[in-house]
Amino acid sequence: MKRYFTQNAVFAGLFRMVETLFGIEIEEKRTSVWHPDVKYFEVKREGKLIAAFYADLYAREGKRSGAWMDGERTRRRLPDGKLVTPVAYLVTNFAAPVEGREATMTHDEVTTLFHEFGHTLHHILTAQEEAQVSGINGVEWDAVELPSQFLENFAWEHDVVKAISRHADTGESLPDELFKKLIAAKNFEAGAFCVRQVEFALFDMLLHAEFNPKTDSVPALLDAVRKEVAVVFPPKWNRFPQSFAHIFAGGYAAGYYSYKWAEVLSADCFSAFEEEGVLNPKTGRRFLTEILERGSSRDAIENFVAFRGRKPELDALLRLSGIVDAPQASKKD
């Protein structure tokens, strides 16, 4: 399947998609960079420069592993009235082209790219002029992943996958048969994974909200949580809490729930595009105006309600995960 996702086709399709949705133009420009592989892009709206970003895509010796986005410059209004243009870094560790052959990507790498580009857009498409609330600055911990996971959903959408795939040898897009297998693999044991995440989140929250270290037992607390939500129970000798680095060493103390909550928000936002057209510019502009441009100038839940017209619901996440079926259209006599 990797041969179907050539890097040039994926990037071209991704850029076309966000240009359509958010009314922007992305153009590569030459400038000084820290490595020959790094690319620099300007983002314009109606010909006017509004942002820029660097893309450092390939793995190399001495480079930190993983994928991430970071802000290099935040949009803000200076005391002299000058408006600072936002700039971001988009960093991954994909395999570089070899011997002149076009680089290809796994679909997992495609979703990683979409995810980090969602973060990038969140920072550079802001309309705020105060640095503290501009871009990704000040966004609540349980909503900062909304734009990234939102954009990920497009990487699983049939028409988008068709548009970004181009076989390295034949030039054909991903066949429907392989697309169905791709979705089936994504949804395999999705219910078990969801329940496991709920278990982690509930244990974390109870540990930080109600646990008394003088009288309570950590294993007993986890056992109580598992009795409430678990489907598969680990052996008695399991010592999961001792290795739960996310909440003890990774910054997610009393916040592990944010992983699943961001999925709820992002899936619900994406469902608006399913209802109104996946590449509907009108829906895209509304998402831009009510969420991306807002930064942290108002509460994230207010941003969501302004876009969706209601409070978050679970249905979209359960459906996109394959846990429940899509509702059938009612038949008319």
Q: What label would you give each PLM region?
A:
Residues 1-333:
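Cation-handling catalytic/transport regions enriched in His/Asp/Glu
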